[in-house]
Curated annotation (Swiss-Prot):
Keywords: Hydrolase
Single Gene Ontology MF annotation: acylphosphatase activity
Enzyme class: hydrolase
Signal peptide: none
Family label: Belongs to the acylphosphatase family.
NCBIfam families found in the cross-reference section: PRK14444.1
Domain of life: Archaea
Protein name: Acylphosphatase
Keyword Hydrolase: yes
Species of the source: Haloarcula marismortui (strain ATCC 43049 / DSM 3752 / JCM 8966 / VKM B-1809)
Catalytic activity: an acyl phosphate + H2O = a carboxylate + phosphate + H(+)
């Protein structure tokens, strides 16, 4: 099974709307490793590592986000996995 890493930047109303917490819960349910954090410019940055299909499911989730989010753009860069273990919210 092939593994990949997606480095994602999400724009819109994505801070203060439980986007990071919801992303962490979904990633843990999906069995994907990585992290998520708020950026000073109002975007959310996330990294997902795992099997291709599971990482793609997380990228698709980023287009929706939490119930209160309003996503306007998702930028994705695919990279070689770095062996991240677990999933965390970074500050």
């Amino acid at each position: 099974m092939a593994h990949t890493r997606a480095h994602v930047f999400v724009s819109g109303r994505v801070q203060g709307v439980y986007y990071r917490a919801t992303t962490r819960e979904r990633a843990q349910d999906q069995g994907v490793n990585g992290w998520v954090r708020n950026l000073d410019d109002g975007r959310v940055e996330a990294v997902f590592e795992g099997p291709d299909a599971d990482v793609e499911a997380m990228v698709e989730f980023c287009h929706e986000g939490s119930e209160r989010a309003n996503v306007t753009d998702v930028e994705v860069e695919y990279e070689d996995p770095e062996g991240v273990d677990g999933f965390e919210v970074r500050w």
